[in-house]
């Protein structure tokens, strides 16, 4: 298998797993009656950001193959997190007059996801050294 085909395969398989995991998270949260605020999107974005932060921190210390980076970072975590769904949810909340919820959704996703990346990188650097 040539490298380009292998790279597409890694992204596709990782993406299928990530998208399926995101769908499972949404279903799980809906089964608990969580619908008033888009917590499922927030949750997957925080978790995905955290694990992407771990991957980045690990890659700074240890060699990570291109196929692993593509499978985990681009495929699995790229499909698990969801900026497009986040954007649609913000517009839907705003269109329904839920401006505070829309603003909170933006703030929580941006601030908490960036904090999750930072926390993961700090956690990795303090536990590995």
UniProtKB/Swiss-Prot annotation:
It catalyses: fluoride(in) = fluoride(out). Its main location: membrane. It is found in: Cell inner membrane. GO terms for molecular function: fluoride channel activity; metal ion binding. It is a multi-pass membrane protein. Na(+) is not transported, but it plays an essential structural role and its presence is essential for fluoride channel function. Pfam families: CRCB. It comes from the Bacteria. Disulfide bonds: none annotated. InterPro entries: FluC. Na(+) binds at residues 78, 81. NCBIfam families: crcB. This is Fluoride-specific ion channel FluC. It comes from Idiomarina loihiensis (strain ATCC BAA-735 / DSM 15497 / L2-TR). The lineage of its organism: Bacteria, Pseudomonadati, Pseudomonadota, Gammaproteobacteria, Alteromonadales. The gene is fluC.
């Amino acid at each position: 298998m040539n490298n380009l085909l292998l790279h597409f395969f890694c992204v596709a398989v990782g993406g299928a797993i990530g998208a399926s995991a995101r769908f499972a998270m949404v279903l799980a949260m809906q089964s608990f009656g969580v619908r008033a605020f888009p917590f499922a999107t927030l949750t997957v974005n925080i978790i995905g950001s955290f694990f992407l932060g771990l991957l980045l921190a690990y890659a700074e210390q240890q060699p990570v193959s291109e196929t692993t980076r593509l499978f985990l970072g681009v495929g699995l975590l790229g499909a698990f997190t969801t900026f497009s769904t986040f954007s649609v949810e913000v517009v839907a909340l705003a269109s329904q007059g839920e401006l505070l919820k829309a603003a909170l959704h933006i703030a929580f996703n941006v601030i908490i996801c960036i904090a999750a990346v930072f926390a993961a990188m700090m956690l990795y650097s303090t536990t590995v050294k």
